[in-house]
């Protein structure tokens, strides 16, 4: 995680990198008490709490959310900053789908039945973006009425349903969610200079 932080500071352009913890997040957001109670009572895990946190921060301030485990190897593309919002999504036109399905068939699927079609660890957004605001509202309503999730990927599923059924015209440009996983896919492979080229 320390290496990831350094990469964000190096390649984050002029953005201020803010590292959040349980105390510092209170400086930026007023999280509803029912959410904090569910988190403290372990009815909500930190992964699902971070879904609320990322959307609330983007809704209120705009900017870029990156999970602490994101390793940047180059500067963030300016085109992502120019869009109203951007996140990596499943690309129907990807040529090497089979390779990705073989790598992780639970996450990477191009089946029409699959509702997990976006990556939430990197999200760009302008303040008060319609899609981000609606996703946040959906999550808040869900957690107000539930104590557990039916699927770990609830944010991704809600995004898919929102875009497919209501906000198709607001969908950001589709750039494959395999792209941010390229390095991780070969992380534990034996070093090969040919493969590097």
Where are these regions (language model features)?
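Active-site acidic Asp-centered loop
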Residues: 61, 66-67
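Glycosyltransferase-associated regions of secretory-pathway enzymes
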Residues: 1-50, 68-197
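Small-residue hinge/turn detector
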Residues: 51-61
């Amino acid at each position: 995680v320390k290496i990831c932080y350094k990469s964000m500071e190096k390649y984050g352009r002029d953005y201020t990198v803010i590292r959040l913890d349980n105390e510092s997040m209170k400086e930026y957001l007023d999280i509803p008490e029912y959410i904090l109670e569910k988190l403290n009572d372990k009815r909500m895990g930190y992964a699902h709490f971070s879904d609320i946190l990322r959307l609330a921060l983007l809704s209120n301030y705009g900017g870029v959310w990156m999970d602490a485990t994101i390793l940047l190897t180059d500067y963030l593309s300016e085109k992502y900053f120019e869009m109203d919002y951007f996140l990596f999504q499943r690309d129907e036109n990807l040529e090497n789908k089979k390779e990705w399905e073989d790598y992780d068939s639970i996450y990477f699927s191009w089946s029409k039945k699959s509702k997990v079609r976006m990556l939430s660890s990197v999200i760009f957004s302008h303040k008060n973006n319609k899609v981000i605001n609606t996703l946040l509202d959906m999550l808040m309503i869900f957690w107000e009425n539930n104590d557990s999730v039916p699927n770990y990927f609830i944010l991704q599923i809600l995004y898919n349903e929102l875009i497919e059924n209501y906000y198709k015209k607001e969908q950001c440009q589709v750039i494959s969610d395999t792209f941010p996983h390229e390095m991780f896919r070969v992380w534990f492979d034996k070093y090969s200079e040919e493969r590097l080229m």
